[in-house]
A protein has these predicted regions:
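Glycine-rich "substrate-gating" loop/helix at the edge of Rossmann-like oxidoreductase active sites
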Residues: 80-85, 112-119, 139-147
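C-terminal amphipathic/interface module of NAD(P)-dependent oxidoreductases
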Residues: 212-246
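Alpha-helical substrate-binding/gating segment
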Residues: 126-134, 142-176
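Mid/C-terminal beta-alpha module of Rossmann-like enzyme folds, strongest
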Residues: 162-209, 242-245
Length: 246
């Protein structure tokens, strides 16, 4: 119903099937099409009905960046990962950029690991802790760029209210290693006796190609969104976990 766009100035796009599923051919198609085709359909409907908007802000992912234990990644990074999810993100952002013909401003938010009490990566990390132990991936040295769900929600609103455009990283200012990620959660949760490393081979056997995302090391910068005037309510990982689990 095109009437749903009556008096709408801005659109926030969060559509897309979960990437945390076995990457079969069918699931790969679902992951890609749920992001790209939904945007293309929306754009075509707006064009056909002569609807102009002030802005669109669309989700994307930090999976666009390569993997590195040393390098910090900014929005201007030109190097890209060479695997399925990076290809999806390329097409996803291309579909978002196509809105430039009908929107005054187009923005993309490359989102990190979203922490929430409603599920996702935090719930998955805590599952083995119910049995008294936590696990980290391989060496545990890989960087993980995370963000509290409240902060990522506010970033989208901040971009619209401040009439921003372009690409922004949706991550908190203080990324941590996978080992520290697991250790801090286990300490806040309590009753976790020990944490153990699980070798990459195990995850490859269980998850297939999808295991790659568990071992990506991406230390992503939040400076650009901060320089635009955004203030994080949850910049610290431990206080974030305490807030969510309280």
């Amino acid at each position: 119903d095109i009437n749903c766009f009556h008096e709408i100035d801005s659109i926030i796009n969060l559509s897309g099937a979960s990437i945390f599923r076995i990457w079969t051919k069918k699931n790969k198609e679902l992951i890609l099409k749920s992001r790209v085709q939904s945007l293309n359909f929306l754009r075509e409907q707006l064009i056909e009905n002569g609807v102009k908007i002030q802005s669109i802000v669309s989700a994307s992912g930090i999976g666009a960046y390569p993997s590195s234990d040393e390098k910090e990644f900014y929005e201007t990074e030109s190097d890209r990962s060479n695997y399925f999810l990076a290809d999806v993100i390329k097409e996803w952002e291309k579909a978002t950029s196509s809105f430039e013909i009908i929107a005054e401003r187009v923005s993309i938010v490359r989102i990190g690991l979203v922490l929430s009490s409603m599920g996702g990566v935090l719930k998955q990390t805590m599952q083995p802790m119910s049995f008294g132990f936590g696990v980290y991936f391989g060496s545990g040295r890989q960087w993980q760029s995370w963000i509290h769900i409240n902060d990522i929600s506010q970033i989208f609103i901040h971009i619209i209210k401040n009439r921003l455009s372009g690409i922004y990283n949706g991550v908190a200012p203080n990324p941590i290693t996978n080992y520290e990620f697991t250790k801090i959660i286990s300490r806040v949760r309590k009753f976790v006796l020990f944490i153990i490393p699980v070798p990459r081979l195990f995850f490859r056997l269980i998850f297939g190609e999808m295991h790659i995302i568990l071992f990506k090391s991406q230390r992503v910068s939040s400076k650009k969104i901060e320089q635009s005037g955004f203030n994080f309510k949850f910049p610290n990982f431990r206080s974030t976990i305490e807030n969510i689990l309280s």
